[in-house]
């Protein structure tokens, strides 16, 4: 690393004739003040004063350094001794210091771009040229330097560089994307777009919110049939017990999960209204008169976000166990939840029924000793394979390349145990498309949530957590993509649950082109 700084030392007044004393002070500082704590042989990494000049009551200084006594730390070190020199002799004090221009250079071989680096606080600009990152900082006041904001930016920059070697690759002993199991080929009975056909038939209707749909009686009957089928084939055989998980998750829980560091842009944030009747009275009056929602008034009546709507569905399980002590003899703890929607903001990523903002899942979560944690995860995958075969669907399972819980852990931290394979992802093949739709995400977290939520075993034995999400909304999409909408092409035990279910008769819907 290399740091180049242009700074200002502001004196309390202009004092002529102090240049000789300043020259002597800076020369001695090179071998004393700026060398303290620097290991022998690494003096070249310490801060050096490249030039200085006095203009009135302002001392302009340029410094360079390596990673030992960074240039801004060197500037801070100069302030007090300089005041002790000038005060008694010239009756002048040092009012403050600031940095007008600061750049950092860092070697990053193989890294071609880190867009988020330029978006960090206090960063003016960032670029990568010939394997070297150049970061230019905004002007910094003394208070910024003393709060170590610069050091935190540097640390985060290093983290971003190191994370370019994906942590998933670092911790996974298998190759992400490697297919580990595949079904036999199946006949497909549909060639169109399932979303378009479902709309044409009136099985779904687009809802005004982005990535949202109204699911009508037919597709809901299919949903319930598949849900009950998976519970009978996967959930009950493994001994999971049903619970009702909250879906409004406090930000503190998401912070413990490291979700806010990893994917803050992928969640819906929620705010509670303030207890201010006057604000809402004004809001109601303007709404009545203008017939438009006065967003400025609404914002005034809403508190800062305090929650997110559940983006992972498993969040309450870790909070339920937080600061609790369990005994290995009583493990595993196995819960499942199917009580409602999961929400993710996909921005421009939402398309049809296969990628929505609001979707249904059966979520399995468990706590066990490491070996059993992996065994449970593997059994959920095996039983999912069996279920897909019984449904006469074509599928494949691969090593996951994006375990959700690794998003916020950009560099591997000491003391956190990771499984050999953090995630398996099962996909249903889609006619005419190379990549199938993901329907099962089976994860082992190691001690990620054990550490984050302070969960402990009574004798300090190792315990891990795991979760498997059975994505009902995507199972339906994959099922319809392969089987089509004619129930005669479906397995009888599914088709009979949907036959006889009809949409209400509405003159204008579904629209017939």
From Swiss-Prot:
InterPro entries: aa-tRNA-synt_IIb, aa-tRNA-synth_II/BPL/LPL, Ser-tRNA-ligase_2_arc, SerS_tRNA-bd. L-serine binds at residues 312, 344, 361-363. It catalyses: tRNA(Ser) + L-serine + ATP = L-seryl-tRNA(Ser) + AMP + diphosphate + H(+); tRNA(Sec) + L-serine + ATP = L-seryl-tRNA(Sec) + AMP + diphosphate + H(+). It is found in: Cytoplasm. One of its GO terms (molecular function) is ATP binding. One of its GO terms (cellular component) is cytoplasm. It is an enzyme of class 6 (ligase). The keyword Lipid metabolism does not apply. Its cofactor is Zn(2+). Keywords: Aminoacyl-tRNA synthetase, ATP-binding, Cytoplasm, Ligase, Metal-binding, Nucleotide-binding, Protein biosynthesis, Zinc. It holds the Pfam family tRNA_bind_4. Pathway: Aminoacyl-tRNA biosynthesis; selenocysteinyl-tRNA(Sec) biosynthesis; L-seryl-tRNA(Sec) from L-serine and tRNA(Sec): step 1/1. SUPFAM superfamilies: Class II aaRS and biotin synthetases. GO terms for biological process: selenocysteine biosynthetic process; seryl-tRNA aminoacylation. Consists of two distinct domains, a catalytic core and a N-terminal extension that is presumably involved in tRNA binding. Belongs to the class-II aminoacyl-tRNA synthetase family. Type-2 seryl-tRNA synthetase subfamily. Catalyzes the attachment of serine to tRNA(Ser). Is also able to aminoacylate tRNA(Sec) with serine, to form the misacylated tRNA L-seryl-tRNA(Sec), which will be further converted into selenocysteinyl-tRNA(Sec). This is Type-2 serine--tRNA ligase.
